Amino acid sequence: MAESLFKKILVPVDFSPCSEEAFRVALTMARTFQTKIVLLHVIDTSALATFNQLGLLAVPSDAQGQKRRLRHHARLNVRRLLESESAEGVAVTRVVLEGAPFTEIAKTARTEKVDLVVMGSYGGRSGSLDKIFFGSTAEKVVRTAGCPVLTVPLPPKSRRS
């Protein structure tokens, strides 16, 4: 039997429809190549710090409470993805980290020694100003991951015109 092209696939998710589509694509690939998946969610602490500085949190000193709520929300959403019928029979390791998403995704790709990153083409923060000044997370991951990156758009029926 030939050696599998991919042994381990990293799938970063922000729970947007596009990232959940990337997870579905990765599950199909995992079945095809008998591959393990690392499912990663990064709590964007840089955004939290900015919200705190701008006074956008209900209580500015409640950043720790907000992080706790975001971790809880992440665990619930990861569980929801893993309990889906399409995830049955695939070996999935879940990881929740804090930091700048593209940095943590690239670090995880290296530390987990993944062969491929499968991620949504765009996520929850797809505002045009953010992209103009900072570039998209997917674009930064393509430049820094150190392995191939497959970006997955929404399926045609889900795309907005």
Regions found by a protein language model. Name each.
Residues 1-4, 80-117, 156-161:
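Structural beta-alpha unit
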Residues 147-159:
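Short, flexible loop segments at boundaries between secondary-structure elements
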Residues 59-76:
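A short acidic, glycine-rich active-site loop
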Residues 2-61:
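Small/aliphatic-rich secondary-structure junction motif
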Residues 116-140, 158-159:
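Glycine-rich, Arg-bearing micro-motifs that act as flexible, cationic patches
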Residues 54-58, 111-112, 135-136:
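Short, hinge-like loop/turn segments at secondary-structure boundaries
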Residues 38-40, 93-97, 150:
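General small-molecule cofactor/ligand-binding pocket signal
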